[in-house]
């Protein structure tokens, strides 16, 4: 999958959004990511909504598929 730096440039993601996208592409769940980053699930879900909007995807599975093609 692409690097965090590449994701920020390709889709105008913030570093936090790009990190979330790469962790999801690596197979981590929203719950695991929230726990590991010591953030609430709601914060992670809000970031995910922003990532989906910026990448033109509508579901987490679409985002992971997109990232696997990059």
Region locations from a protein language model:
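Short helix-to-turn junction characteristic of helix-turn-helix DNA-binding domains
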Residues: 24-28, 67
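Pre-signature/interface helix of ABC/ABC-like ATPase nucleotide-binding domains
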Residues: 5-11, 22, 53, 65
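Short, basic, alpha-helical segments at the C-terminal edge of helix-turn-helix-like DNA-binding modules
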Residues: 60-70
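The N-cap/first-turn positions of alpha helices
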Residues: 16-20
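Linker/hinge segments immediately adjacent to helix-turn-helix/homeobox DNA-binding domains
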Residues: 1-15, 31, 70
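Recognition helix of helix-turn-helix DNA-binding domains
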Residues: 27-62
């Amino acid at each position: 999958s692409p690097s965090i730096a590449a994701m920020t440039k390709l889709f105008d993601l913030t570093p936090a959004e790009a990190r979330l996208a790469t962790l999801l592409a690596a197979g981590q769940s929203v719950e695991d990511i929230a726990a590991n980053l010591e953030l609430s699930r709601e914060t992670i879900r809000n970031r995910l909504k922003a990532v989906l909007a910026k990448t033109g995807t509508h579901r987490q599975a679409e985002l992971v598929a997109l990232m696997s093609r990059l």
